[in-house]
Amino acid sequence: MQTDVLVVGAGPAGSAAAAWAARAGLDVTLADAETFPRDKPCGDGLTPRAIAELDALGASQWITIRARNAGLRAAGFGQTLYLPWPGGSLPNYGSAAPRLQLDDAIRKVALEAGVTPVEG
């Protein structure tokens, strides 16, 4: 198999990198040891920066139906802190999505860009 770019790992970063490379006209193969969709027990939180990246990638349409949060709440040692998102050039909200859905949505964007998948 010949390819210009081999991306190993079809999580959010790998799938996004593969999509951007394919959109730049490169022949891209995206390899992952698992079969998709697959779940991971970590990383469900989406910061405003993550929301902005999903928007830029064209993968944010499914996130708009999810609950939004306006910041983080940290509790411990007898106190609770509320930390609002900074805003500025980023969206003023965050969200959360199960990795089962997030990873699959970004991977589908990569496949739509012409990426060749290799799974399992």
Locate predicted features:
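Conserved N-terminal helical subregion
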Residues: 1, 52, 68, 74-120
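Glycine-rich FAD pyrophosphate-binding loop
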Residues: 6, 22-42
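Small-residue (primarily alanine) positions within well-ordered alpha-helices
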Residues: 10-13, 17-22, 110
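Short phosphate-binding/catalytic loops that engage adenosine nucleotides
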Residues: 26, 59, 115
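N-terminal FAD cofactor-binding segment of flavoenzymes
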Residues: 39-77
